[in-house]
């Protein structure tokens, strides 16, 4: 019987074989998984985030950091998806130079204005003023806080402080 899972757009395609849609590119699999067939999911692992960029998910999983989806070589474990890692993601008009995801070394503090809607605590960037070099300064959700002072994020409410916080305060 001819396999109809190319592409698998309807449930009738999955009578003899299942198919998995990786972004917009369907692939045939030999056995049915625990999840329903023919679902437009990027990864088998439940911890993989939805892929916003179709080109990211041809052969890899993807994870969204800030506003940009990032391709990774393998699916993460469920425990890692709630913890942001250092990925080279550009936020707003400035590109923060983080180290690669998965490295044990901590991110180098950078000075960029965070304009993402919900910036993740990726590289702990300081203020626009490079004199604010303390690694404990949290990402600045409010750009107005970062012109001459540092800001500390408490939950989702940023507050401006008059000077850089000490490493013990964050």
Swiss-Prot record:
Keywords: Keratin, Repeat. Pfam families: Keratin_B2_2. InterPro entries: KAP. It comes from the Eukaryota. The keyword Repeat applies. One of its GO terms (molecular function) is identical protein binding. GO terms for cellular component: cytosol; keratin filament. Residues 8-168 are annotated as: 17 X 5 AA repeats of C-C-[RQVSGE]-[SPTQ]-[TASP]. The keyword Repeat applies. Signal peptide: none annotated. Sequence repeats lie at residues 8-12, 13-17, 18-22, 37-41, 42-46, 51-55, 61-65, 66-70, 75-79, 80-84, 85-89, 90-94, 95-99, 140-144, 145-149, 150-154, 164-168. Belongs to the KRTAP type 9 family. In the hair cortex, hair keratin intermediate filaments are embedded in an interfilamentous matrix, consisting of hair keratin-associated proteins (KRTAP), which are essential for the formation of a rigid and resistant hair shaft through their extensive disulfide bond cross-linking with abundant cysteine residues of hair keratins. The matrix proteins include the high-sulfur and high-glycine-tyrosine keratins. Interacts with hair keratins. This is Keratin-associated protein 9-2. It comes from Pan troglodytes. The lineage of its organism: Eukaryota, Metazoa, Chordata, Craniata, Vertebrata. The gene is KRTAP9-2.
